A protein has these predicted regions:
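Extracellular/periplasmic, surface-exposed regions of secreted and cell-surface proteins
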Residues: 1-178
């Protein structure tokens, strides 16, 4: 005769994400601009030993061609100088910080098996970036030239590492490196 295996499954998933963002741009006579901003993130994906992350940013833009005493520099009819510094983050997956198990059903009975080995110290990957550049309008603004130099440094990079399968955990563990 034919036999059928019945499988029942129920799952309840809850994640909590809290963030706050503020930004202000201050201008002076339409040729000097300063932008200040900040973001704070807290997420249930962060490990239990980590509370939240603060990401500041600042940028300055100076437009000498709009300052009132600009007569041009040869073929350069307009010029904007700019610089910025900021931080940004990449959060881990919702359950990467937690150790989890799988429910198993077999002909021999029910059981559990290791699934994910969590990391209570897990936190977001953070990138710090600095940039400097300019925009120039050439030949009565018929041509535009833009240049940007930037440098990014990433710390606490999220890295998936595999443990020996003999330990029972089949999934890779996400951890911070660097």
């Amino acid at each position: 005769g034919a036999a059928a295996q019945q499988v029942n499954f129920e799952q309840f998933v809850e994640t909590i994400n809290v963030g706050a963002f503020v930004q202000e741009q201050i201008g002076y006579n339409d040729f000097l601009f300063v932008t200040l901003g900040a973001r704070f993130d807290a997420h249930s994906a962060f490990g239990s030993n980590f509370n939240g992350q603060f990401y500041p940013k600042v940028s300055v833009s100076y437009i000498p061609s709009d300052s009132g005493n600009w007569s041009g520099l040869g073929p350069i009819s307009s010029l904007q100088l700019r610089t910025a510094y900021g931080m940004a983050g990449l959060q881990p997956g919702a359950f990467d910080a937690f150790t989890s198990y799988l429910a198993l059903a077999s002909a021999n009975g029910a059981g559990i098996a290791p699934n994910n080995l969590g990391d209570p110290d897990l936190k977001p990957e953070v990138s710090k970036e600095f940039e400097i550049g300019f925009n120039a309008g050439l030949f009565n603004n018929k041509f535009n030239l833009e240049f940007t130099y930037w440098d990014r440094i990433t710390t606490d990079a999220l890295y998936a590492r595999q443990f020996p399968l003999s330990g029972g955990f089949r999934n890779q563990q996400l951890t911070n490196v660097g």
